[in-house]
Curated annotation (Swiss-Prot):
Residues passing through the membrane, by range: 72-92
Protein name as annotated: Neuronal vesicle trafficking-associated protein 2
UniProt GO MF annotations: clathrin light chain binding
Keyword Transmembrane: yes
InterPro entries: NSG (IPR009431)
Gene label: Nsg2
Subcellular location field: Membrane; Golgi apparatus, trans-Golgi network membrane; Cell projection, Dendrite; Endosome membrane
Ranges per topology, Lumenal: 93-171
Membrane topology (Cytoplasmic): 1-71
Organism in which the protein naturally occurs: Mus musculus (Mouse)
The keyword Membrane appears for this protein: yes
Tissue expression remark: Specifically expressed in neural and neuroendocrine tissues. Pituitary and less in adrenal gland and testis. Expressed in the hippocampus throughout development. Remains enriched in layer V cortical neurons during development. At P0, broadly expressed in the neocortex. Is down-regulated overall at P8 and P14, but remains relatively enriched in layer V. At P0 is lower expressed in the cerebellum. Expression remains low throughout development, and is undetectable by adulthood.
GO cellular component: cytoplasmic vesicle membrane; dendrite; early endosome; early endosome membrane; endosome; glutamatergic synapse; Golgi cis cisterna membrane; late endosome
Length: 171
């Protein structure tokens, strides 16, 4: 601890007493120039370009990669190839998934077609294949136009057989 009310400039003060447990320490000491700067070295070594020339000669040559870097590159590329194969397999399976058709329909040529049409045209001659596709396309167009004309809440018979309003005589 530092004893308060002591002046470090007083040289003739009484010596510090150990009895009271305080030490008289000057809070500010004068600075000496020798302690501010380090002594300059006697010998300075300056590295020149000639020391680095052996490294520059090897700089232009092909550097063989380290084995650890090479194996990591191979492992990363194999992992990416494996993931790409899995993605392609999932996409392929999603597009070629065996679709289920309602009862009375058969899945053929990526479409659900009525089983009666399939049985009829499969018993025909081989040239009937083009007619088969024509019937399918007409069937799907007719199905779409019927679905647009009739709402799902109305029956087909109610739309066709609507009662006509009675004609009034006069105008």
């Amino acid at each position: 601890m530092v004893k308060l009310n002591s002046n470090p400039g007083e040289k003739g003060a009484k010596p510090p007493s150990v009895e009271d447990g305080f030490q008289t320490v000057p809070l500010i000491t004068p600075l000496e120039v020798n302690h501010l700067q380090l002594a300059a070295p006697e010998k300075v070594i300056v590295k020149t370009r000639t020391e680095y020339q052996p490294e520059q000669r090897n700089k232009g040559k092909f550097r063989v990669p380290k084995i650890a870097e090479f194996t990591v590159t191979i492992l990363v590329s194999l992992a990416l190839a494996f993931l790409a194969c899995i993605v392609f397999l999932v996409v392929y399976k999603a597009f070629t998934y065996d679709h289920s058709c309602p009862e009375g329909f058969v899945y053929k040529h990526k479409r659900c077609i009525p089983a009666s049409l399939d049985a009829y045209y499969s018993s025909q001659d081989p040239s009937s294949r083009s007619r088969f596709y024509t019937v399918i396309s007409h069937y799907s167009v007719a199905k779409q136009s019927t679905a647009r004309a009739i709402g799902p809440w109305l029956s087909a018979a109610a739309v066709i057989h609507e009662p006509k309003p009675p004609k009034t005589q006069g105008h």
